Every structure is written in structure tokens, then in C-alpha cells.
Amino acid sequence: MQKRLTLLGSTGSIGDSTLDVVARHPERFSVYALTAHRNGDKLVEQCLRFAPEVAVVGDAATAAHVEARLRAAGSRTTVLYGPQALVDVSKSDGCDTVVAAIVGAAGLAPSLAAARAGKRILLANKESLVMSGAIFMDAVRDHGAILLPVDSEHNAIFQCMPRDAAEHGGIAKIILTASGGPFRTREPATLVDVTPDEACKHPNWVMGRKISVDSATMMNKGLEVIEAHWIFGLPGDRIDVLIHPQSVIHSLVSYRDGSVLAQLGNPDMRTPIAHALAFPERVDAGVEQLDLAQIAQLSFEKPDYARFPCLALALKALAEGGIASAALNAANEVAVEAFLERRIGFMAIAATVEAVLDALPNRAPDGLDDVLAADAEARRLAAEIIAKAPARRVERTV
């Protein structure tokens, strides 16, 4: 039976890759809803190609622009806007599958709505679990939702895990691989001069600017450790991080009998997306087959926590529990935005996050509202810290 998709964040890199796979298999997948924030022109192009019933944008002005262009082209797609519209298309009876690809905390509410509606959720929005892991996973279990990870590392682990949950006791640990980003071998003393464009030049993956910066700081890998903790139910001390510059082995599962299972493939997000879309079947993703003879060599190294303090901060937040992970994520989003706008330097990202975690008392969250309150407080503190640190501002341009 054809799957009906709501694609949250259709104009981003995950959205592009998802629609590429969808277009290859029109007999398997159709689109119920596409959503974007303010990239209205790209959303219009997608709507004209995939003919969703609904399109959602962030504000009224963008909605008016999108609707005018769609009507002029003869499209009947309904255009909505605002956070509630995102929630509505995520829980609508018009879809059975929700691809959660909105970057950042903005993706939490619609992803949670999809879980509470019992949808099949392809999760690329790691912040949903970083901010409110217990709440989100409880919703998945309580409402019979199906959670399929789309992040390449978590999808790799999922593929290497036994299908029977009763066999999970045989797992010793899981190992998330990381490329090390663009600054893996750069002298740490020179990182203070890094520009946004340099930080966004990932050596292997094509990604959006925010996640590219997170990869450069390795905050992304720290968030993925937290995400893996919630998805796979393992404590932090059984989740390792391993630098693997070639990005061919996407993650590994180590078993108690000494076996290690790994998932390999070219670094292309269409592979995990196609796996999750068609699961438990396999379909063509348009990805070139891996040629190990051409690659010839795979290398590995332990992460340097002095070079990547954001990774250490994320692991600390996971160990502390409570609202620490939500605060970590919120402070990082504010700091990365400031860096991309050249208001702070690269190394100030970690410094800002650490200062917020030190200033905000940790506590056990009392429901989703408490998590959102912690998120708001961490954002306020991060903004204050950035505003009071003019010496860190970056004047250099590319």
C-alpha cells in the first residue's frame, strides 16, 4: 500500500534527499504535506512537482507569497502557516508517515504530535530526543507509534541491531562514528580565527549550515550520543564515539561474544532515508555502490576532547540528566546562530554553552512545559552572555 507522507522541513538538505527518493518510487510514496519556514520559492517548486494537499510555512507573509504563486500555476494545494499548522499536518489522518526533518527545537512539537497520533515517524530531528527524550519515547510507546531513525549513525545502529528486542541483552556497546569535521587536524590555536564559511565546508557530507557548524564543533556527535541513549535504551557509558575520517562506516554494534557488526556505505543521506521509508523492504536510493577497493584504507582515532569541548559538554549533560540536555541544545542553537552571523568567534560557541550550563540550576523536568521553560531560560542566558562579551566578536570577513 502506498505510504502518505508529511515532510517537515522539506526545503532543507534532508527534505531534498527525501523527495529525491520519493520521486524514484511514485508507486510506493505520495506526499500529503510539505513544510518550510521562509523558503517559499523552493516550497512552491516542490509543491508543483509533488502536488501535496497541504503546504505549511512559518508566517503569514510567506504564506501569502506561496499561495499567490501556487494559484497562478493552477495548484490546489492548501497553504497554512504557523506552529499549530505544523502540529496539525503531523497528526492528520491524511498521512501515515511523518518525516521529521525540521532543524532545532522548532521540530519538537510537531514530532511529538506525530508520536501521540501513532504515526510512523522517520526521525531526523534529534532535538526532539535531546530536549525531551523520556516524554517523547513514552509517547511513542503509549500511542503505538513506530520510530525509525534517519540520522546515518542511528540508522546504521538500527540496521546492526537484532530485530528481536529480547536479544538486546547481548549488546556490549554501540559505537558512533564521526568524520571529525573540517578541523580534525587543524592546530587548536588557530581555531579562534575560523570563519562561518570554513566551518560549513564539511569534508564528506552535504548538510545545512547549522548542522555543518555542529559537525565542526562535534556538538552534533554529542547530541547524537544523547539521541542514541533514548532510541536504543543504553546508558552513556555504553555509547562510544570514534573518529573515522572517511565516513564509510556509519556506526557499529559490539556484542558480548566479541562480534562487531558495522553498516557501511557511501556518505549519502539518501541511503538511510530510503531504508527508513521502505522498511522492512529495500529500494533503490540512487546511491552509487560502495567500492572498498577504490577506498583502499579506513582509519580510526579517538576524539580529542580538548579540541572538541562541545562533545565533552554533551556527554556531561547526558550524565547529569534532568534539563541539562535541553539547556545544552538551546544554548548551542543561540551560539551557533551568533557565530553564523559573525557576532562571536568559533571557540566562543563552546564557551557560551558551558557558561549557560554552569549558570542554570539542573532539575528533573516536570512535563513538557517545564522542558520548554528550561529551553527558553537557556536561550535567554545564552543571549545575555553573548551580548556581554564584545571582545569575542568576529570582525574578519572572507
Curated annotation (Swiss-Prot):
<feature type="binding site">
    <location>
        <position position="39"/>
    </location>
    <ligand>
        <name>NADPH</name>
    </ligand>
</feature>
<dbReference type="InterPro" id="IPR036291">
    <property type="entry name" value="NAD(P)-bd_dom_sf"/>
</dbReference>
<keyword id="KW-0414">Isoprene biosynthesis</keyword>
<keyword id="KW-0560">Oxidoreductase</keyword>
<feature type="binding site">
    <location>
        <position position="152"/>
    </location>
    <ligand>
        <name>1-deoxy-D-xylulose 5-phosphate</name>
    </ligand>
</feature>
<keyword id="KW-0521">NADP</keyword>
<feature type="binding site">
    <location>
        <position position="13"/>
    </location>
    <ligand>
        <name>NADPH</name>
    </ligand>
</feature>
<comment type="similarity">
    <text>Belongs to the DXR family.</text>
</comment>
<feature type="binding site">
    <location>
        <position position="202"/>
    </location>
    <ligand>
        <name>1-deoxy-D-xylulose 5-phosphate</name>
    </ligand>
</feature>
<dbReference type="InterPro" id="IPR026877">
    <property type="entry name" value="DXPR_C"/>
</dbReference>
<dbReference type="InterPro" id="IPR013644">
    <property type="entry name" value="DXP_reductoisomerase_C"/>
</dbReference>
<dbReference type="GO" id="GO:0030145">
    <property type="term" value="F:manganese ion binding"/>
</dbReference>
<keyword id="KW-0464">Manganese</keyword>
<feature type="binding site">
    <location>
        <position position="11"/>
    </location>
    <ligand>
        <name>NADPH</name>
    </ligand>
</feature>
<dbReference type="GO" id="GO:0030604">
    <property type="term" value="F:1-deoxy-D-xylulose-5-phosphate reductoisomerase activity"/>
</dbReference>
<feature type="binding site">
    <location>
        <position position="125"/>
    </location>
    <ligand>
        <name>NADPH</name>
    </ligand>
</feature>
<comment type="function">
    <text>Catalyzes the NADPH-dependent rearrangement and reduction of 1-deoxy-D-xylulose-5-phosphate (DXP) to 2-C-methyl-D-erythritol 4-phosphate (MEP).</text>
</comment>
<feature type="binding site">
    <location>
        <position position="127"/>
    </location>
    <ligand>
        <name>NADPH</name>
    </ligand>
</feature>
<feature type="binding site">
    <location>
        <position position="14"/>
    </location>
    <ligand>
        <name>NADPH</name>
    </ligand>
</feature>
<dbReference type="InterPro" id="IPR036169">
    <property type="entry name" value="DXPR_C_sf"/>
</dbReference>
<keyword id="KW-0479">Metal-binding</keyword>
<dbReference type="Pfam" id="PF02670">
    <property type="entry name" value="DXP_reductoisom"/>
</dbReference>
<dbReference type="GO" id="GO:0070402">
    <property type="term" value="F:NADPH binding"/>
</dbReference>
<feature type="binding site">
    <location>
        <position position="220"/>
    </location>
    <ligand>
        <name>1-deoxy-D-xylulose 5-phosphate</name>
    </ligand>
</feature>
<feature type="binding site">
    <location>
        <position position="224"/>
    </location>
    <ligand>
        <name>Mn(2+)</name>
    </ligand>
</feature>
<protein>
    <recommendedName>
        <fullName>1-deoxy-D-xylulose 5-phosphate reductoisomerase</fullName>
        <ecNumber>1.1.1.267</ecNumber>
    </recommendedName>
</protein>
<feature type="binding site">
    <location>
        <position position="153"/>
    </location>
    <ligand>
        <name>1-deoxy-D-xylulose 5-phosphate</name>
    </ligand>
</feature>
<dbReference type="Pfam" id="PF08436">
    <property type="entry name" value="DXP_redisom_C"/>
</dbReference>
<feature type="binding site">
    <location>
        <position position="153"/>
    </location>
    <ligand>
        <name>Mn(2+)</name>
    </ligand>
</feature>
<dbReference type="InterPro" id="IPR013512">
    <property type="entry name" value="DXP_reductoisomerase_N"/>
</dbReference>
<feature type="binding site">
    <location>
        <position position="151"/>
    </location>
    <ligand>
        <name>Mn(2+)</name>
    </ligand>
</feature>
<feature type="binding site">
    <location>
        <position position="215"/>
    </location>
    <ligand>
        <name>1-deoxy-D-xylulose 5-phosphate</name>
    </ligand>
</feature>
<feature type="binding site">
    <location>
        <position position="38"/>
    </location>
    <ligand>
        <name>NADPH</name>
    </ligand>
</feature>
<feature type="binding site">
    <location>
        <position position="208"/>
    </location>
    <ligand>
        <name>NADPH</name>
    </ligand>
</feature>
<feature type="binding site">
    <location>
        <position position="126"/>
    </location>
    <ligand>
        <name>1-deoxy-D-xylulose 5-phosphate</name>
    </ligand>
</feature>
<feature type="binding site">
    <location>
        <position position="12"/>
    </location>
    <ligand>
        <name>NADPH</name>
    </ligand>
</feature>
<feature type="binding site">
    <location>
        <position position="221"/>
    </location>
    <ligand>
        <name>1-deoxy-D-xylulose 5-phosphate</name>
    </ligand>
</feature>
<comment type="pathway">
    <text>Isoprenoid biosynthesis; isopentenyl diphosphate biosynthesis via DXP pathway; isopentenyl diphosphate from 1-deoxy-D-xylulose 5-phosphate: step 1/6.</text>
</comment>
<feature type="binding site">
    <location>
        <position position="179"/>
    </location>
    <ligand>
        <name>1-deoxy-D-xylulose 5-phosphate</name>
    </ligand>
</feature>
<feature type="binding site">
    <location>
        <position position="224"/>
    </location>
    <ligand>
        <name>1-deoxy-D-xylulose 5-phosphate</name>
    </ligand>
</feature>
<dbReference type="InterPro" id="IPR003821">
    <property type="entry name" value="DXP_reductoisomerase"/>
</dbReference>
<dbReference type="Pfam" id="PF13288">
    <property type="entry name" value="DXPR_C"/>
</dbReference>
